Regions:
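Acidic/histidine-rich alpha-helical segments that form the ligand environment
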Residues: 88-126, 137-142
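Short, contiguous alpha-helical
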Residues: 1-10, 14-27, 31-34, 39-87, ...
């Protein structure tokens, strides 16, 4: 087997990280997870479960934005956990709020993908305003966090009768 250069290895790793952030392997993609949720069920919490589809969507959006902001903003300010990371209401204030949340999530996800894919981004360099974190760690955190909550969203949708295989 031919030995790869560091540049080739970094390009390969970046390509796989972008793919992991965008789609991943072992779960439903984000677009499918949020598609066709009836407006009347977006704020529904099923018995025995703590979240509505809206709460999970907004938590994913807010958390991903926060990770992105931390990854690229020297003036980053940590938000208060947990209240700043979850919506205040079980249901979106409007159908437009649901749509805007999805659009913002996708926009921030693309921004994270661009940050990772940028040839100037050193995945292993410590983020100067952090406490040892790297862009590699933050990219994996975005992918991991989103995959976890996409799974929760599917469970919630099944429980409220809003998921068809």
């Amino acid at each position: 087997m031919r030995r790869r250069t560091t540049t080739q290895t970094d390009k390969t790793l970046k390509r796989w990280l972008v793919w992991l952030i965008r789609e991943g392997n072992a779960h439903v993609p984000f677009d499918r997870a949020v598609a066709r949720v009836p407006a009347r069920l977006r704020g529904k919490i099923s018995a025995g479960l703590p979240y509505s589809p809206w709460m999970l969507l907004e938590h994913m959006r807010i958390s991903q934005w926060d990770i992105l902001d931390f990854s690229r903003n020297p003036g980053y300010r940590q938000m208060k956990w947990p209240e700043a990371y979850w919506p205040r209401t079980e249901a979106p204030p409007s159908a437009a709020a649901w749509t805007r949340s999805i659009a913002a999530f996708k926009r921030d996800r693309r921004a994270m993908e661009r940050l990772v894919a940028n040839p100037k981004t050193d995945l292993y360099a410590t983020i100067p305003w952090g406490q040892g974190q790297t862009i590699l760690r933050e990219a994996l955190l975005v992918a991991d966090h989103n995959a976890y909550h996409i799974g929760q969203l599917i469970v919630v949708r099944r429980a409220i009768g809003a998921w068809k295989e």
